[in-house]
């Protein structure tokens, strides 16, 4: 999967929780999640707006330590 799918913030939060991230706080329209990937502590901020822009989605993936391919595998 080389292209990013169109996802909402709520869908990303659900995916991150499924791989072990936990919700730390929710302030306004953003959720802060904490988790561990590859032995590193990761903090991810996810906006809960409608569909996420591709740049925002890429930034969230980078913060979470995920690749586009791993995201595709999680969506299957």
Language model features by range: what are they?
Residues 1-27, 37:
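N-terminal first-folded block
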Residues 3, 42, 71:
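Glycine-rich, flexible loop/turn motifs
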Residues 23-55, 59:
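A short, structured beta-strand/loop element
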Residues 51-76:
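C-terminal structural segments of small proteins and small subunits
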């Amino acid at each position: 999967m080389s292209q990013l799918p169109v996802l909402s913030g709520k869908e990303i939060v659900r995916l991150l929780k499924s791989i072990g991230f936990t919700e730390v706080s929710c302030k306004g329209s953003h959720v802060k999640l904490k988790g561990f990937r590859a032995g590193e502590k990761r903090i991810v901020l996810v906006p809960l707006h409608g569909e996420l822009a591709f740049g925002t989605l890429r930034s969230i993936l980078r913060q979470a330590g995920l690749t586009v391919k791993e995201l595709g595998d999680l969506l299957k």
